[in-house]
Amino acid sequence: MTVSTAQMRFWSPEVRELEPYVPGEQPKIQNLLKLNTNENPYPPSPKVVEAVQEVLHEQADVLRLYPDPDATVLKQAIAKQQNIDVSQVFVGNGSDEVLAHIFKAFFLQDGPILYPDITYSFYPVYSQFFGTKTKEIPLNENFEIDVRDYTQPNGGVIITNPNAPTSIALSLAEIEQVLQANPDRVVVIDEAYVDFGAESAVSLINRYENLVVCQTTSKSRSLAGLRVGFAIAQSHLIAALEAVKNSFNSYPIDRFAIAAAVASFEDQAYFEEQCQKVITSREKLVRDLTELGFNVLPSKANFIFATHSQHDAGQLAQKLREQGIIVRYFNKPRINQFLRITVGTNEQNARLVQTLKQDIL
């Protein structure tokens, strides 16, 4: 939408300066292979479908009532699955909303918050939106986070682990180094992709009062369409998030989303099975692309980050699109020769590989 300067006179001055986040493309094209937004290729647990149907058909009358503002049953399900106390759980309308509350609750400090120069692109958006001071820390030449860079004075730290879009993960020992170096600042570990092979920092919660772990049901639990995210931390940090939430939107999660998420957390066997399928498919996709001449960064996510020395990444993305396959291309410094490719089913990955081999490379 184009808005004229004259029309912008109604806008707040700060809004005129915003550079909003650009979501991944959601095209409505038949027979399209969509490997650009890291959605799970498999459906949610059948128990999720049953739970949603129960709300719709057996509890329809309650839809006239507001949902539980605390989403208590969901917090209980998360606490049980993570083996923590319910007072250590915060829930929100997707992890993006949870992250927004985190920025408001903890990062309006005198010093700058630290995050990598190549990371989730919502961080600079939130920083601008809330007026947070920031300092971007360059990844090393191998696109890895050097935790020693996060020991300098700051107003807080946020790290995606595994990182996005690079897919590379830190160890728990490295995360502990960051926590120990910043005892008076909040350290946020954004674990949107942690269930695909990385180590979760949730196990460190009771040892570090400055740690917040943020997760989502969108990736590993196939619930991107329902928007349920959560944070785990000691109760004094959760209290700050609740204060922000109840100053913004007291009812962030609807009844369908609560029921679906609870059912997902209660079906651990299905969750683990689907995660392993993605991991196995990822490993084969890496092998296949490597044979085609791609250099693929070591991935612990449900996507890979790959470059080809003989082919321009932007042109590859365009040629794939012409063949009905969409991947994510970032026209940004340092990564403009990489493609981020979501791991699909074995059949979807095979279509990608065959298209590259027969029609493009």
Curated annotation (Swiss-Prot):
N6-(pyridoxal phosphate)lysine modified-residue sites: 219
Gene name per UniProt: hisC
Cofactor(s) for this UniProt protein: pyridoxal 5'-phosphate
Any Gene Ontology biological process: L-histidine biosynthetic process
A Pfam family hit: Aminotran_1_2
Keyword rRNA-binding: no
InterPro entries: Aminotransferase_I/II_large, HisP_aminotrans, HistidinolP_aminotransfase, PyrdxlP-dep_Trfase, PyrdxlP-dep_Trfase_major, PyrdxlP-dep_Trfase_small
One annotated GO molecular function: pyridoxal phosphate binding
Record-given protein name: Histidinol-phosphate aminotransferase
Top EC class for this record: transferase
Lineage: superkingdom: Bacteria
Subunit (UniProt): Homodimer.
Record-stated family: Belongs to the class-II pyridoxal-phosphate-dependent aminotransferase family. Histidinol-phosphate aminotransferase subfamily.
Functional pathway: Amino-acid biosynthesis; L-histidine biosynthesis; L-histidine from 5-phospho-alpha-D-ribose 1-diphosphate: step 7/9
Assigned keywords, A-Z: Amino-acid biosynthesis, Aminotransferase, Histidine biosynthesis, Pyridoxal phosphate, Transferase
Enzyme Commission (EC) number: 2.6.1.9
Catalytic activity: L-histidinol phosphate + 2-oxoglutarate = 3-(imidazol-4-yl)-2-oxopropyl phosphate + L-glutamate
Keyword Transferase: yes
